[in-house]
Regions:
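Dynamic "connector" segments at or just before major functional cores
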Residues: 1-100
Length: 103
């Protein structure tokens, strides 16, 4: 399974006209930025801008990196328990692949 497989079932509650940035691009950006030390929406945006070529190895980012307010709005619109469940599922897959009881 890939990272995206764990998150693709999350409901995107944005209206059709407000979907300039792909939900999975924003989730991927947010998770990898936080794992790299980002501590807020501006840090996530800055990480995305500085690592866009690397990010595009995994996701399209057709519209580039969204501004920090857009990242915040998109992530905040997700159902927290569903997001947590997706994240735990992804981490558990990694844990199982490396044969560890704990990560």
């Amino acid at each position: 399974m890939s990272f995206i497989t764990h998150f693709e079932s999350l409901e995107d509650k944005r209206s059709h006209i407000n979907k300039k940035h792909d939900l999975l691009d924003v989730i991927f950006l947010t998770v990898v930025a936080i794992l790299s030390g980002a501590e807020g929406w501006k840090d996530i945006k800055q990480f995305g801008d500085s690592k866009l070529d690397w990010l595009r190895k995994f996701r399209a980012f057709k519209e580039g990196v969204p501004v920090d307010d857009t990242i915040a709005r998109i992530i905040s619109s997700l159902e927290p328990n569903a997001l947590l469940t997706s994240f735990i599922s992804w981490v558990n897959e990694i844990r199982e692949e490396i044969g560890r009881a704990h990560v």
